[in-house]
Amino acid sequence: MTGLDALDWLVVGAYFALLAFVVWRSSRKQETSADYFLAGRNIGWFVIGASLFASNIGSEHLVGLAGSGAKSGVAMAHYELHAWCLLVLGWVLVPFYYRAGVYTMPEFLERRYNPTARWILSLVSLLAYVFTKVSVTVYAGGKVFEVLLPDLEIAGVNSFWIGAVTVVVLTGIYTCFGGLRAVVYTDALQTVVLILGSLCITAIGLYHLGGWAELREISGSERFNLWRPASDPEFPWPGMLFAAPIVGLWYWCTDQYIVQRTLAARNLKMARRGTLFGAYLKITPVFLFIVPGMIAYALVQKNMLVLGDPDQAFPAMVSQMLPVGVRGLVVGGLLAALMSSLSSLFNSCSSLFTVDIYKKIAPEASERQLVSVGRLATGVVIVLGLLWIPVMQRVSGQLYEYLQSVQAYLAPPMTAVFFLGVFWKRMNGRGAVATLVLGFFLGLAKLGCQIYAGSAPEGGLSAMQQVLVSYGSINFLLFCVYLFLFCCATLVAVSLFSAPPPAGQIENLTYATNTTAGRREVRESWNRWDIIHTVIVLLIILSVYVYFRG
């Protein structure tokens, strides 16, 4: 069974009509930049947690994680077990962000360090969104259409590009008009549909396969092992143990795309509990997306599923295995997830450009002008993301691995600057700027050399070409560890050899400079239930690590 039937299209249409209603209801009041970029700072814990999950579980998860599961097994689950990073966000960093009253992460860096650090992070973040998240999400949207509607063609344009452009245009429209409030409330709805739909795929896939025991037997112990040998070219255990947390802490604790939801919380308690709820949800992709990919691999081995390439695992199972009607609901959730991820990106890009760049250039701009500029910035990001899609296919054979490799080159300097800045009051602006500049330069150089190595001939290279190829061929996880250590050393050395930051500048921005009132506010924002749920999340993560040992 392939394609969609009339009932499927009816379900998809009804689902998007409901989404449109949610967007309309949530976007009627957009009077100020705080309303547009931070939803009026009045969001509760459930919506925050659901939005954290839906924004993270975009196309790169629906398509990329299932693809990795189909090709390599459970190894990519390391990234999905980063639910503990959300606990770090809620307990460690959110109190500083919330008390600072900032709109963006670069704005926090300016408060902690200096304006130069803010400029650097703003520009690099915008570029990173285009070259990783936006392009990957758009690419995955095209892959979904390619599988579900393989024969669709308009004026010589195939279904891949029709799908990619359609997802971008529709998402751009509702993001521009709805702002963050529309984004987070549609995220909450999409979270429910995503979980239910993905559970259907997992359950039906296991039913056709013959159960969990059959999956284990066909997959073998290696595919059920989170810990690969140190010599593994894709997932060496030292890299997964030490590098993956570096990327996870950057993404979940310092990335505007994620943290913006907590900045919109009604109060500090709602922000932290939103991260706790998000941590529970974050564990589910191991079973909702990676395991279906492994099921797809097993079904292919039994000649029960037709699969062109690993990245088609999830949409192929939707198209070929789900019954009519249910298939339409899951497809609606699948496409909505693509749009949810993109809408979050567009809103974050708007916030970064408007608050950190345009507002610095035009400080007298009115609230209406700020919202208009943010909407215009969305259009530019859309075009750049579409242009980058052909390039990214040369970097890595798998969608999700591409995203992780690029993030591994950009995360180390940001992780070092944020965490050392909060834990050590001696870190200063000069150290932060030096770390960001050198770290980003080395990371982008690695990306460039990796692209070059992918197209370089096998023989006849000069000495310089061989150096570039060797640098580009370093495993991205191991490179992430080396770069992080270099960035930490740079930040510490430059800071210690220059003047410390003024005491007034870092008040309530580091643990050592917290005021009595600040400590009291944090203590009053949690109780024993927050502790209990934190422990439960950690125990679940530990249990998954113990089970998936081959």
Residue ranges with predicted function:
Residues M1-G550:
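Membrane-embedded helix-loop-helix hairpins and adjacent transmembrane boundary segments
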